[in-house]
């Protein structure tokens, strides 16, 4: 230490520093904590820059007894670094508030703080006297050691800087290491004590913690930090780099949160409804009834659960009979607390939401996202003034019309659009609709109507139910005729219990969904609701093809222009008349006044009311206040029928407009806005279903007609192909004569009539046409039966083949009666039927018509091979083989006119057919006409020479050999040699070796 720069310190009596000792070295302006190992900033001057006058002791020195004990316990050398340290439990408060005071520029008198520290009469020490008495000496010793460590580094900084520049840093001595270990030990003790203190504060009641936080905030305001920049830098580095700084900041944030929570808790307005939080998943309403039974009977306890799973969400609402009962319970559990299922419950009064339709959680989340201020206005969705579209709060321009947001753009939130500061629901003004909350699941409309009709007549009442379970959702809307009636009912029913189940009703004015910013202008609130109902009803009926019928105007209006002008004038005059009641609004579509609640149309000229359900006109009786039906409405139609045409025309010219309103299922049911919207959605869904069904029917009809037309065309083509085949391919026979049989015009007409039937016709028409077709076919067969038997057989085969597909496919009962074909038919029919079964060895018949028809159908080669080479199973069963050939040819062959089963000589086989086929031998199979032979010849090969470049290859063609060892079921394998057979003692390796040798031996033998 430089004695010329730092003089000898004074004793504790005067507690003053010499004039050369700057404020940056004053121990009273440094924190009593362990600083980091950094050194003072070399860029700062170490001269006496801040010349502040020394502090004065305003409250006097310590008592002599305290001073004597202090001098005996501590050496005089260390007393000059001593400063009043606060206990570690409140170090965070000290750092936090002293920093805030330094930023604001308020520096306090530290000598006053020191004297008040040891005076023992301040509020701070009195509130926590027990704790200070236990930890007084520890905190002082801890602060002395920590401050001495920092002071030593500050005083020896010149020497240490020189050592660093020379490159030889001086190591710490054992005393320094011992001092650091002792500091760490005290720090760990302080942290443990802080944890115990925090757990003790959590066990205390909220009111005590609130009072203690107030006293603590008063005490901590007496401390401040140093004004020197050097001391300030060290304090900041400690808070940012050390573990203790993070711990203090975290505890400070936790304490501030508890203070705000306690302030909100105690500042909440007491109410008869209490919210319980902290419930377990298995806690039920019965458990809450039991633990709260000592505070009297409870009106209702409801545990909030998930809508889908039914699991408890962890909180519940408890309704007390009165506010005093709820306050008594809250005061009692404030000190004792309640534990249920091993969890401590938290109670607080139920508070209403801040805005209409916005929950408290959403409000807090929005406020946190925009800075967290309690008094700030959270941005809300806004409505475009150009197109009336609702935009999100973050948008600066409308997403529909791209117009920028202006200051005049109204808020989409009704509660905020009416007031700039976001008023409560009750501050927006009364309405004639009340919302009733606090209902249970068993509530119904009759109960509410009985309760509210005592005070004022009810115009409409709607209990909101779940759309899937139809269970009450806990609230309802009551519509009165006037605001005065609604106000009267509100004052009489709010916070009252129902007579049936004792539920406490929470009644308030309802908010209209159509506020000032929605673009709907109407003279009153009821007109807004009625206009919305008409709009919803119009929307629903435009998709309903049954409900809203088009208006019918008289035919003379289109021809008579004057009549048109007169009708328009009547409508304008009717529109100019005033509405009979407040619920009626002008409907441009019908030309009448319409009441959405009753469903009546009002004619301003005649003063009559039209019921859209019954189609009758009524007059309103003011005395009885009832609707009286007009007389002679049913007889009007009969009289009109008996009148002559001139009278009918005259009456039709006098009629104005005939409307057909939407029918409602129940006359007594009142049509409200939500009902109209729901009806619109249902009508839209129904119309969509009908449209889908109509499209499906159209597709099915088109598909059916397409199939019918394809089938018709195929049958017609088959008939004409058969006719052409009969005239070109049929061989002449002595029994047939020169002229082949042809189909008559009557047969063709009956055939066309039979084939033109489709599935789209009705059953009656189909039956008639079937009978006509059958009659035509029978007449045809009768007319042709007089000719030769050969001609009749051929023609019957043609007709049966033509009519069998259509008539048999249409109905199994409709069949054509044909005489059976006997085996004794003439050979001509056999030749005709056999002419279509041409084998692959036959040369095709030369004919221009036949060449033009390509062979695209399936060819049964297996049947051809069986007929050519024979089969072991076909001997003695020629009838079956013949029928198989006919079936294969019926599916498709080179013959364009295949015969159906049983027609054209079925079961008749001759030996001439089999002998007409040419047997292909091995010599003929590979001859000059072979494709491979021709390819080799084109490449220069000739018979007798070998293959390859020099002709040394094979000369004979490869003969294919069939392998019958494993060809099909029942085949016997070649017997293996005895040396390759598997013996009982052979291993797997030996087995593989034997199989490989046997396979090699077999291949060698085959080659």
Swiss-Prot record:
SUPFAM superfamilies: Ran binding protein zinc finger-like, RNA-binding domain, RBD. It comes from the Eukaryota. Gene3D superfamilies: 3.30.70.330, Zinc finger, RanBP2-type. Residues 227-236 have a biased composition (Basic residues). GO terms for biological process: mRNA processing; mRNA splicing, via spliceosome; regulation of RNA splicing. Residues 272-352, 432-512 form the RRM domain. Residues 40-49, 94-120, 138-185, 204-214, 237-264, 849-867 have a biased composition (Basic and acidic residues). Residues 631-645 have a biased composition (Polar residues). A zinc finger (RanBP2-type) spans 378-407. The keyword Cell inner membrane does not apply. Residues 1-185, 204-269, 556-581, 631-656, 725-755, 771-797, 810-910, 945-977 are annotated as: Disordered. One of its GO terms (cellular component) is nucleus. The keyword Ribosomal protein does not apply. Residues 778-793, 823-835 have a biased composition (Low complexity). Interacts with the pre-spliceosomal component U2AF65A. Splicing factor that controls alternative splicing of the developmental regulator ABI3. Reduces splicing of a cryptic intron in ABI3, leading to a decreased in ABI3-beta transcript. Regulates the splicing of the receptor-like kinase SNC4/LRKL-2.6. This is SUPPRESSOR OF ABI3-5. The lineage of its organism: Eukaryota, Viridiplantae, Streptophyta, Embryophyta, Tracheophyta.
């Amino acid at each position: 230490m430089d004695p010329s720069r730092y003089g000898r310190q004074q004793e504790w009596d005067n507690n003053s520093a010499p004039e050369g000792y700057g404020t940056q070295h004053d121990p009273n302006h440094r924190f009593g904590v362990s600083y980091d190992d950094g050194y003072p900033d070399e860029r700062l001057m170490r001269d006496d820059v801040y010349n502040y006058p020394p502090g004065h002791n305003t409250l006097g020195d310590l008592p002599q007894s305290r001073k004597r004990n202090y001098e005996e316990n501590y050496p005089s050398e260390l007393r000059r670094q001593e400063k009043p340290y606060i206990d570690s439990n409140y170090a965070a408060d000290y750092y936090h508030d002293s920093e805030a005071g330094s930023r604001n520029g308020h520096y306090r008198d530290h000598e006053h703080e020191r004297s008040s520290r040891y005076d023992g009469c301040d509020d701070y020490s009195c509130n926590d006297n027990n704790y200070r008495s236990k930890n007084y000496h520890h905190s002082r010793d801890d602060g002395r050691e920590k401050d001495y460590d920092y002071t030593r580094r500050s005083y020896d900084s010149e020497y240490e800087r020189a050592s660093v520049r020379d490159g030889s840093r001086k190591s710490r001595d054992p005393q320094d290491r011992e001092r650091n270990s002792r500091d760490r030990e005290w720090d760990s003790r302080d942290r443990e004590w802080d944890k115990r203190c925090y757990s003790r504060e959590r066990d205390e009641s909220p009111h005590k913690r609130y009072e203690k936080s107030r006293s603590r905030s008063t005490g901590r305001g007496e401390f401040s930090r140093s004004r020197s920049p050097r001391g300030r830098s060290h304090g900041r580095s400690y808070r940012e780099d050390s573990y203790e700084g993070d711990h203090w900041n975290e505890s400070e944030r936790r304490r501030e949160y508890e203070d705000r929570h306690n302030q909100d808790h105690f500042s909440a307005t007491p109410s008869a409804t209490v919210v319980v939080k902290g419930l377990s998943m298995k806690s039920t309403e019965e458990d809450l009834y039991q633990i709260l039974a000592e505070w009297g009977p409870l009106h209702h306890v409801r545990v909030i659960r998930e809508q889908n799973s039914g699991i408890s969400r962890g909180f519940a609402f408890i309704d007390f009979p009165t506010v005093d009962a709820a306050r008594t319970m809250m005061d009692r559990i404030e000190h004792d607390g309640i534990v249920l299922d091993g969890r401590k419950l938290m109670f607080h009064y139920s508070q209403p939401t801040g805005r209409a339709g916005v929950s408290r959680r959403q409000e807090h989340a929005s406020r946190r996202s925009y800075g967290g201020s309690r008094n700030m206005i959270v941005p809300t969705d806004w409505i475009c003034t150009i197109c009336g579209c609702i935009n999100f709060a973050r948008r600066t321009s409308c997403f529909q019309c791209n117009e920028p947001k202006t200051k005049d753009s109204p808020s989409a939130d009704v509660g905020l659009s009416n007031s700039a500061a976001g008023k409560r629901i009750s501050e927006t003004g009364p309405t004639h609709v009340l919302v009733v909350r606090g209902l249970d699941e068993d509530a119904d409309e009759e109960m509410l109507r009985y309760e509210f009709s005592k005070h004022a007549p009810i115009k409409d009442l709607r209990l909101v139910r779940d759309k899937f379970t139809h269970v009450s959702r806990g609230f309802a809307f009551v519509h009165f005729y006037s605001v005065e009636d609604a106000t009267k009912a509100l004052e009489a029913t709010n916070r009252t219990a129902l007579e049936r189940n004792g539920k406490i009703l929470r009644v308030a004015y309802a908010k209209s969904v159509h506020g000032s910013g929605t673009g709907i202008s109407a003279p009153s609130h009821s007109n807004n609701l009625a206009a919305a109902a008409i709009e919803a009803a119009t929307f629903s009926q435009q998709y309903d093809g049954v409900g809203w019928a088009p208006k019918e105007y008289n035919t003379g209006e289109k021809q008579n222009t004057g009549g048109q002008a007169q009708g328009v004038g009547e409508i304008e005059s009717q529109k100019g008349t005033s509405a009979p009641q407040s619920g009626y609004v002008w409907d441009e579509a019908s030309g009448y006044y319409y009441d959405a609640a009753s469903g009546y149309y009002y004619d301003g000229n005649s003063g009559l009311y039209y019921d859209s359900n019954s189609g009758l006109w009524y007059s309103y009786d003011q005395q009885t206040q009832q609707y009286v039906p007009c007389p002679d409405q049913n007889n009007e139609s009969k009289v009109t029928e008996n009148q002559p045409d001139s009278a009918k025309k005259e009456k039709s010219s006098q009629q104005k407009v005939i409307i057909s309103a939407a029918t409602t299922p129940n006359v007594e049911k009142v049509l409200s806005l939500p009902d109209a919207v729901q009806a619109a959605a249902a009508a839209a869904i129904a119309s969509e279903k009908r449209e889908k069904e109509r499209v499906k029917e159209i597709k099915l009809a088109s598909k059916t007609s397409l199939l019918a037309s394809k089938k018709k065309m195929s049958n017609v083509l088959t008939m004409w192909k058969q006719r052409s085949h009969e005239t070109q391919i049929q061989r002449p026979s002595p029994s047939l004569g020169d002229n082949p049989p042809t189909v008559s015009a009557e047969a063709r007409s009956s055939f066309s009539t039979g084939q033109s039937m489709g599935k789209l016709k009705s059953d009656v028409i189909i039956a008639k046409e079937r009978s006509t077709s059958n009659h035509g076919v029978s007449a045809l067969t009768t007319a042709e039966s007089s000719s030769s038997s050969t001609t009749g057989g051929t023609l019957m085969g043609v007709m049966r083949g033509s009519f069998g597909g259509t008539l048999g496919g249409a109905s199994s009962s409709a069949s054509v009666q044909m005489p059976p074909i006997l085996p004794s038919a003439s050979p001509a029919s056999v030749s005709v039927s056999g002419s279509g079964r041409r084998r692959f060895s036959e040369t095709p018949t030369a004919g221009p018509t036949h060449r033009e028809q390509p062979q695209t159908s399936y060819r049964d080669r297996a049947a051809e091979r069986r007929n050519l080479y024979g089969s072991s199973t076909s001997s003695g069963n020629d009838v079956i083989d013949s029928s198989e050939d006919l079936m294969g040819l019926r599916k498709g062959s080179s013959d364009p006119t295949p015969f159906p089963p049983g027609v054209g000589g079925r079961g008749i086989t001759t030996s001439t057919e089999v002998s007409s086929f040419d047997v292909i031998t091995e010599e003929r199979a590979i001859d000059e006409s072979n494709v491979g032979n021709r390819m080799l010849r084109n490449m220069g090969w000739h018979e007798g020479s070998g293959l390859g470049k020099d002709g040394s290859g094979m000369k004979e063609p490869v003969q294919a050999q069939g392998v019958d060892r494993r060809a099909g079921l029942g085949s016997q394998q070649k017997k293996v040699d005895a040396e390759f057979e598997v013996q009982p003692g052979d291993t797997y390796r030996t087995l593989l070796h034997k199989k490989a040798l046997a396979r090699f031996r077999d291949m060698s033998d085959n080659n």
